[in-house]
Amino acid sequence: MSKYAGIVLAGGMSSRFGEPKALASWQGGTFIEHILKVMTSTLQEVVVISHSDIKERVEKLVQVPVIEDIPHYKGNGPLAGIVSGMEYIEADWYAIMPCDAPNVSHEWFTILLGQTSNEYDAVVPIINGRKQPLLAAYHNRVKEKIYALLQEEKRSMVQLLSQCNVKYIAGEDVQANADWFINVNTKEEYVQAQKDLSNE
């Protein structure tokens, strides 16, 4: 069993973005390739959770396993993806990553995993005053809490956090690097993120 593993939530077609975000072009590759390059530099084991409509395309791009949600919970949002990844890889802690934050740095995973300890169920950053539960780390024991929520047809990350002993991190090293956590939800945000990248 690894101490740490990574779970990337690739999702599928995005109505707001107009295409699958995981496959959007970024730095000569795609969002998903860039995120995996960063994660695999820090984590030995990483799995991608993908919607069936893009799974084959993602598999051609990446060198890590690509799976779909556990059938019973298919389509139940990020909680289903996280628990599916936890079932696929055995680890003590899981670093979660959405596919629409392409600016993430390997330094972030070093900071995040450095904050984990057995007394906590989760480590979650607070960026510009907002909790970021999909850019966080969760202990293996959270798996049972997720199953309990899904059984009750609850899909909210906020509901999960309310049941966990969470260590929130909002230190200088996090706030000074808020651009690591930029989410790209629309084409406008995508254009802006590319501009910001070329200005660096």
UniProtKB/Swiss-Prot annotation:
Principal EC category: transferase
GO molecular function: GTP binding; metal ion binding; molybdenum cofactor guanylyltransferase activity
Record keywords, A-Z: Cytoplasm, GTP-binding, Magnesium, Metal-binding, Molybdenum cofactor biosynthesis, Nucleotide-binding, Transferase
Residues reported to bind Mg(2+): 100
UniProt feature coiled coil, ranges: none
Chief location of this protein within or outside the cell: cytoplasm
Domain of life: Bacteria
GO process annotations (BP): Mo-molybdopterin cofactor biosynthetic process
A Pfam family recorded for this sequence: NTP_transf_3
GO CC annotations on file: cytoplasm
Chemical reaction(s) catalysed: Mo-molybdopterin + GTP + H(+) = Mo-molybdopterin guanine dinucleotide + diphosphate
Cofactor(s) needed for function: Mg(2+)
Keyword Magnesium: yes
Binding-site positions, GTP: 9-11, 21, 69, 100
EC number annotated for this UniProt entry: 2.7.7.77
UniProt keyword Nucleus present: no
Annotated compartments: Cytoplasm
Family: Belongs to the MobA family.
Chain's role: Transfers a GMP moiety from GTP to Mo-molybdopterin (Mo-MPT) cofactor (Moco or molybdenum cofactor) to form Mo-molybdopterin guanine dinucleotide (Mo-MGD) cofactor.
Entry's free-text remark on domains: The N-terminal domain determines nucleotide recognition and specific binding, while the C-terminal domain determines the specific binding to the target protein.
Annotated protein name in UniProt: Probable molybdenum cofactor guanylyltransferase
Source organism of this protein record: Bacillus thuringiensis (strain Al Hakam)
Gene from which this protein is expressed: mobA
